[in-house]
Amino acid sequence: MSNHTHHLKFKTGKRAWKPSKYFIVGLSCLYKFNLKSLVQTALSTLAMITLTSLVITAIIYISVGKSKAKPTSKPTIQQTQQPQNHTSPFFTENNYKSTHTSIQSTTLSQLINIDTTRGTTYGHSTDETQSRKIKSQSALPTTRKPPINPSESNPPENHQDHNNSQTLPYEPCSTCEGNLACLSLCQVGPGRAPSRAPTITLKKTPKPKTTKRPIKTTIHHRTSPEAKLQPKNNTAAPQQGILSSPENHTNQSTTQI
């Protein structure tokens, strides 16, 4: 700010000095030629010019100072805020680094815990599978239930065909006591034991067929007006015709069926 004001003062003084310099040179020339009256008038005019120039420079200086007085407050505010701006990123970077390292450490610890828990779960599962395999190998072959298919296209009757043949283990005849089924299936000795166990085929029970009975339909015929007029002509016939009418109707209905 101070440099700028000094520069403006120097420019205004330089502009006022040029005409005054030429004026002084002219006055000196007139003084040599002994023109006192002219010199006095010139000196008076020069004094007036210098006074006016000084007044003009003072006015310019005051106006420039007022116009530049307002922005002078802003640099002071910026200077007070600059140290805060310089120091805040340093602290934020340190905070970011510390938080980043803490997050990484927590994630790594969580991953390690997950891996250990997975290892334990896998260990339990492998032990369970091995125990199941040993149990299945040690157990004797038993009747297996047919698998349940959720689809409706395969009916459950197809599964019974696969399970009709059942394999039985080797049993000696000495264990059978009065059981005819056991005697028919047992072997006398181990030497005669067949390569394959005998199979029992179960016969399917046929389903009872349902026969639909025919439904009887009775048709009632209306008597014609000619039949009603016949009793008037014959005196004995009307009673027979009236009595025989329901029998005739039943005979007609049975014949039509």
Swiss-Prot record:
Annotated segments matching region Binding to host heparan sulfate: 187-198
Site (Cleavage): 65-66
Region of interest (Disordered), residue spans: 70-95, 119-166, 190-257
Segments crossing the lipid bilayer: 38-66
UniProt similarity note: Belongs to the pneumoviruses glycoprotein G family.
Protein name: Major surface glycoprotein G
Cysteines joined through disulfide linkages: 173-186, 176-182
A Pfam match: Glycoprotein_G
Compositional bias ranges of the Polar residues kind: 73-95, 231-257
Known glycosylation sites: 72, 80, 85, 87, 92, 105, 163, 199, 233, 248, 251, 253
GO terms under cellular component: extracellular region; host cell plasma membrane; membrane; virion membrane
Organism: Bovine respiratory syncytial virus (strain 375)
